[in-house]
């Protein structure tokens, strides 16, 4: 064969490999996107990474990074399509075409900011040149560690974890009570990596280990679901979903409509026997404690009906900054405790690179004051006892709810306003609520401005859920529970453990004995 023909065959083979790599990345990213709500084909989580992992065994590092990033970009673009629901922003004074550009830019930017983490993971997995169980341990520890680190700090956006896609799988999700969402994520990555090793090496032992691991997850879930729920003090919880359009909510007429809607909802729930009422995030879009409170008509209703309320509005500090706050009002309409939103939405409520992009971001928000974040040590005392609270983005972070439950909270409440976004966001947010309920072994009650509002029991089962973009006011029985899950006691113990196992696999693979033993693993 001539040199030209040989070179041509090599080029054709390389082209085929390149196409195969792109297909593996796009296919894996698409599978992850379909696994997430609202499609909710969660079973795909257990195999979605297999094509990419198989392909990466023979791929060099720079290309591995771009293929991993491509897989992540496809995944997050599907997952975060609800960001396009920002458009149109004409009610904020932004023209139609610039509004569309802002929505598209936000969608692509946030997707890319998450996708590169998968690219880095793929690159490092390839760079280590590990194989067998060492590769599996390293892949698991690295995935868990990188995503945990990226979930820290002001710009953290821990949305779209593999556990979130498995939240609707009642057998699988029980695992999070043992080690939180990160444990379930690690198990899913381990199954993917073991299947990929089996495929690449043609050794059925790895597939057997993967099947054993997955079976253990589901057997534990089956056993847990067969147990009766613990007894606890019963509580009739009322929820109001006002369904006030975002474009109208911030106008003078809209504020009057808001007050009328929530006063009516409160009256309905009090008449239906509610013992505690929850409103959505900023249900009352103004400073609650100012002397001329626009929500004054609600106060005599509370004093007459004597049903306490967890009411969300703004709270202002002496320095002029405001917080998104839950006010615990007793039967006399007195504020007995408050909870300020802990995790502010990046590029919305808190602004990285403030000097550079601050003016633009403020133009996109109806709240013009500086927003301050609450502390992790907050405790919301209510007339029914200590309650673990979260507001909007807080439910993406397990640490706040866990800390409050460890301090004695017997119920979780989540107050949110998802009216900014498209309909795909609501089921994803609801999946986070299910994770938080199972992690802590508590009922979770969620109130959303436009849906969905829901009640989730300690096993992740939804006992009540509303529609999207509808008004709703309902009463649902829950129980105030005590006792601690392993996760509530120990937190994210799996994160350092997986990091240690990854390091162990890396060290073993680098040692002379480890290099000699690669053929046997």
UniProtKB/Swiss-Prot annotation:
Principal place of residence: membrane
InterPro entries xrefs: Apolipo_AcylTrfase, C-N_Hydrolase, C-N_Hydrolase_sf, LNT_N
SUPFAM superfamilies in alphabetical order: Carbon-nitrogen hydrolase (SSF56317)
One GO molecular-function entry: N-acyltransferase activity
A Pfam family the protein falls into: CN_hydrolase
CN hydrolase domain boundaries: 240-480
Keyword Zinc: no
PROSITE patterns: CN_HYDROLASE (PS50263)
Pathway: Protein modification; lipoprotein biosynthesis (N-acyl transfer)
GO biological process: lipoprotein biosynthetic process
Membrane topology: Multi-pass membrane protein
Locations listed in the record: Cell inner membrane
EC number(s) from the headed UniProt entry: 2.3.1.269
Keywords on record: Acyltransferase, Cell inner membrane, Cell membrane, Membrane, Transferase, Transmembrane, Transmembrane helix
Transmembrane segments: 34-54, 64-84, 100-120, 137-157, 176-196, 206-226, 488-508
GO cellular component, one term: plasma membrane
Gene3D superfamilies with a match to the protein in the record: Carbon-nitrogen hydrolase
Active site (UniProt): 281, 341, 392
Functional note: Catalyzes the phospholipid dependent N-acylation of the N-terminal cysteine of apolipoprotein, the last step in lipoprotein maturation.
Family the entry assigns: Belongs to the CN hydrolase family. Apolipoprotein N-acyltransferase subfamily.
HAMAP family given in the database record: Lnt
Identification of the protein by name: Apolipoprotein N-acyltransferase
Species of origin: Gloeobacter violaceus (strain ATCC 29082 / PCC 7421)
